[in-house]
Each structure stands twice: as structure tokens, then as C-alpha cells.
Amino acid sequence: MRLSKYYIPTLKETPTDVSVTSHVYSLRSGLIRQVASGIYAWLPLGLKVLKNIENVIKEEMNKSGILEVLMPLIQPASLWQESGRYNDYGSEMLRIKDRNNREMVFGPTHEEVVTDLLRTTLTSYKNLPLILYQVQWKFRDELRPRYGIMRCREFLMKDAYSFDKDFNSAIESYNLMFKVYIQIFRRLGLTPIAVKADSGPIGGNLSHEFHILANSGESTLYYDQDIINLINNDNIDIEKIKNTYTAADDLHNSETCPIPASNIKTSKGIEIGHIFYLGDKYSKTMNAAFSQNNETQLLHMGCYGIGVSRLVGAIIEVSHDNNGIIWPEEIAPFKFSLVNVFSANKECRNISENLYAKLDSNDVLYDDTEDSTGIKFSRMDLLGMPWQVIIGKTTIEHGLIEVRQRSSKKSLLMSTEQFLNNFKKS
């Protein structure tokens, strides 16, 4: 993609009402723009990142046999009244009426809808276990939206729901989703710390939050230092991970902690996912059941959420420097930024154009503008593509291009042929 043809409204200065790094860089790099308090428009560059994260999530879910659906954003209030949760979200849940004066809600979550879906469509216990997921926009009227896309009112979420015939099978589904979450976060370049958590208005008696370590996090985490190695191990052992001590500040007690204080690490964390075993909380109140051996039994359920749009902010929080964002390669909007620092030089221009023509335009952002070298480098550092390909003086004098890694700032000199052979298919 040619920068001259792309729309990236960058900002030179940081807005005065912005505090956290992810909010600063998501505005300055032209990922988003605020439309109202806690509500953002996603611009071309930001939307590419959002879609790349969504694709990673879908790939991991799909290869684990989890089926994608799409449920309605507007839901009948009657389902929430039936489940007993209509008042649980208070003013956070937006309530509306249609032209027939029927009460509807703008869904903050989808437990009621998916339970209703299964109770009306499940025909046999042989369809169990079953896990369904969707990637859907949601709305919660936060009292104090802040930190940009980290805590906003409208957000993109991946939510999944499991249905099983008994407790043991439900825990197997829970553990499967636990493992899938670790795989997703690792592909995104993150090391998730799973901590036992309160279930809140979602319900159930077992839940884990997934956090990443970040100084800007709102939660304080306490964890056995061995958990990092377990999370990063190629062979993910869910039982070992679940049995290794981790706790957020609301559940940690230093006096009753079962491991030595010398083994405990403390850090701030950002929540990026949450999983719940719900039991029969919804199936009982909404009569979602199946029949086996002429006996009617309630479904055992679980639910599992990842804040997709929140992940964009969380990744920036842990992957940046003083110059801008450092995108992990898996989700970067472009893999390469191609920079011609001598745009007035015919030879440099021809080399840049020829190289650009040989690259996939979806993989490269080509700065073909007439801006100064300093502006070009500052802009590319801000935007954070993993690799910067620089055409300049060395190219003219020695026939070599400079390939600079954004994260390490290390550079390699090579011919265009070497670059294409080494990087194009990597």
C-alpha cells in the first residue's frame, strides 16, 4: 500500500486529556478517533490490526473444533427477565423500546440468547459436548470510560459458550478453552497469567481471569514465579497451571498463601480474558435441558470471553518504546515499511518502485511521499511495523538496502534479491 494513497491521520502532539501509553499511541498513530465518550471509530490502520487479532482468535478456535455463530446485538428484555439478570447490570445495560413498545436491551453479553437458542434447537444429547463462539460488538454504559480502547462503552468481544451433559464433561470443555486461550495469547506475543476470580453478575462457581503483566494495569497480581515457564512450555499442562498459585489482590492473603514468600512475584496486570464454569445457573432458570435414557437433565454450561478491541490497547501497553508502537509480526497492519529517504533521486525511486512491485501490497506500507527523512523515520517508528526497509545512500553507493528490525533496532545490509529470498516468504 502506498502511503500517499492510504489514510493515516497521525498526530504530532499528545492530546492533553490522555494518560495511558496505549491511548496516546492509538490516537497519534491514527488507529482510532473518539466519536463520543467511550465510543471510537476504527480507522483503516486500526481496523487492520483488529481484524488480524480476530483472525488469530478464529484460527485457534476453529482448529479446536469450536463452531462460529453470530447472535443478535439487540435482545428481548424478556429473556433477561426470565434468567433473573435484568436488573444485575443496572445502568450499564442500555434499554430501549421498539415501535410496538416491546422492551429490548442492547446486549452487554449473550448468555440468555445462547441458552434460548440451545433449548429450542438441541435435538439430542448426542450433539453434546458443544461449544459455540462469536465475535460481536457489545455495549456497556460504563460510568467512567477511560484509557481509550482499554475501558470504553462499545467494544469488540469474542464470547464462547459450552454445553455439556454433566460436570466432568463441562470441566473438560473449560480446560479446552483454558488451553485455547493460552495458545491465542501466545500467538499474539503475550504471556498470560491466569488467576482465580470472582464470577460477578455472570454467575457460576469457577472462573479464571487472564492478565498480562504491565505497569499500567489496574489489578495487582500475586503469582508463583514458576507459572511463567508453565505458560510458555510447548506442552501446555492445564492442571499444573491451574494448581500453581496465582491470585489477584482481592483474593490474595499473605498469611494463608500456601507457598513461601520468596517464590511469590507481584506485578500489575491488565485483564484480557475471562472464563467461567456456569453449571446450571442459566439452564435451570430458562429450562434448557436434554433427554437421555428417558430422563430429562439440565445442560451444564460455561462461558468464555476475550476483549478483542481491548487487546489492541493491551498489546501496545507491553510492546512500545519512546518512539511509538512495536507491533508483533502476527498482528501488525503491515509486515514491512518501505522508506525511500532520497525520494528526489531517480535511482532510489526506481529501486523503491521495483521492490514495492515485487512485494504483496498487503504486507508493505510504502512511504512514497516527499516528506523529509526525519519525518519519514519518525512516522514509521510511531506506526510500528516490524521491519523497516530503507532505500538510501548505501543503496546508491553499494547496491544494498538496509533492513531494520523495529523491536531490536538492529540493521542488516543486503541486496534486494537477498531480501526477497529471505523475507518475502517468511
From Swiss-Prot:
One of its GO terms (cellular component) is cytosol. It is found in: Cytoplasm. Pfam families: HGTP_anticodon, tRNA-synt_2b. HAMAP family: Pro_tRNA_synth_type2. GO terms for molecular function: ATP binding; proline-tRNA ligase activity. InterPro entries: aa-tRNA-synt_IIb (IPR002314), aa-tRNA-synth_II (IPR006195), aa-tRNA-synth_II/BPL/LPL (IPR045864), Anticodon-bd (IPR004154), Anticodon-bd_dom_sf (IPR036621), Pro-tRNA-ligase_IIa (IPR002316), Pro-tRNA-synth_IIa_bac-type (IPR004500), Pro-tRNA_synthetase (IPR050062). This is Proline--tRNA ligase. One of its GO terms (biological process) is prolyl-tRNA aminoacylation. The keyword Transcription does not apply. Its EC number is 6.1.1.15. Homodimer. It comes from Ehrlichia ruminantium (strain Gardel). The gene is proS. Its main location: cytoplasm. Keywords: Aminoacyl-tRNA synthetase, ATP-binding, Cytoplasm, Ligase, Nucleotide-binding, Protein biosynthesis. Coiled coil: none annotated. Signal peptide: none annotated. Belongs to the class-II aminoacyl-tRNA synthetase family. ProS type 2 subfamily.
